[in-house]
Amino acid sequence: AAECLGVNSRIQLAQVTKVMQRRINHAHMAAGVTMVDPDQVWIGPDAKIAQDVELLPQVMLMGTTEIGEDSVIGPNTRLTDTKVGRGCVIEETVAIEAQLDDAATAGPRAYLRPGTHLCEGAKAGTHVEIKKSTIGRGSKVPPHVGQRSK
């Protein structure tokens, strides 16, 4: 029945979009991706996700985003045209045209703008915003730097 749905209103567009999103999510789960709540995960048709990735609620993977094995994404995370290596942890983060190498972490509430590169094991901490910068292997960008930081 879903193969012949028409789109003549915003309501019908939402219904057809939901059908397609379920198909995309089910295909990824069949390939070994874990979704805690598939109804709260949005994956664009061009995103690539390796097996053993865990997607938590409120995740959006847009454009040509790629996620490497054993990474955990979310909750509340939007990645657009972003490359994520193996074993990364990204929570409550927005990343646009960024690259995270293996074992990098971001968040909570990090904003990785275009040109951001987190090298292997690097961390962008809480409330950090980075643009057109490379964070070296094992380096950390904390939310506070200086005398009163802990």
Segments the model singles out, each with a brief description of its role:
Residues 1-40, 45-46, 52, 87:
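Terminal amphipathic alpha-helical/low-complexity segments used for targeting or macromolecular assembly
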Residues 34-150:
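Structural signal for interior beta-strand "rungs" in well-ordered beta-sheet cores
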